[in-house]
């Protein structure tokens, strides 16, 4: 059995559903293999465990929102799927090298555009990139 297409399904599932709770059981089910085989194979294929990939995806999305959205760090934390502001801030700091607030402040100093928070809550944070492409 060629496992890569199955792993890709789980990878895509993470990309689409990063904002909700995802566990190894669900991801392995999407890939159609056992949990342990899935975890080992995913890491071999992508260089990260599924949970580390999910965390990085959430942090990348948070970076997007911090640069472009007029939302608080707490709102962004919960929008991208973290359940604790403390764990979000510490993971963000570890992966990005600065706190979410410092990251936002650095980007705000460059004068980037901000999307109103009410728009994001209406459309969802996943639409931000697609909508901005249509604005220009």
Task: For the regions a language model picked out, list residue spans one by one.
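Alpha-helical bundle regulatory/interaction domains
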Residues: 1-35, 44, 49, 61-136
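Short, basic-rich loop-to-helix N-cap that marks the start of a DNA-contacting helix
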Residues: 52, 56
């Amino acid at each position: 059995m060629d496992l890569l297409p199955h792993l890709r399904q789980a990878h895509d599932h993470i990309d689409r559903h990063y904002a909700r709770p995802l566990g190894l059981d669900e991801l392995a089910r999407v890939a159609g293999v056992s949990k342990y085989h899935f975890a080992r194979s995913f890491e071999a294929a992508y260089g990260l465990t599924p949970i580390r990939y999910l965390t990085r995806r959430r942090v990348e999305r948070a970076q997007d929102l911090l640069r472009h959205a007029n939302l608080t760090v707490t709102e962004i934390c919960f929008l991208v799927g973290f359940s604790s502001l403390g764990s979000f801030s510490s993971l963000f700091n570890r992966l990005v090298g600065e706190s979410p607030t410092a990251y936002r402040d650095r980007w705000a100093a460059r004068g980037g555009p901000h999307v109103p928070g009410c728009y994001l809550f209406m459309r969802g944070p996943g639409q931000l990139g697609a909508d901005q492409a249509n604005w220009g």
